[in-house]
């Protein structure tokens, strides 16, 4: 629970540019995970859900900011 709160506070403290950079990094990581899975090299499949949830959290924060006008 504390991890989630610290993650939320970390996201709210970042600028929009930093959020977009982090989002792009996570998208690249997700692509690499899919590539590794196709090749049969992926050991930790739970990383998929963690990366996808992080992407969703960042997108939610960006949407929240765009609707509030920041």
Curated annotation (Swiss-Prot):
Family statement drawn from the similarity comment of this UniProt entry: Belongs to the universal ribosomal protein uL29 family.
HAMAP family per UniProt: Ribosomal_uL29 (MF_00374)
Signal peptide positions on this chain: none
Gene Ontology CC terms, in alphabetical order: cytosolic large ribosomal subunit
Protein name: Large ribosomal subunit protein uL29
Domain of life: Bacteria
One matching Pfam family: Ribosomal_L29
SUPFAM superfamilies linked: Ribosomal protein L29 (L29p)
Annotated GO MF terms: structural constituent of ribosome
Keyword terms of this UniProt record: Ribonucleoprotein, Ribosomal protein
Listed GO biological process terms: translation
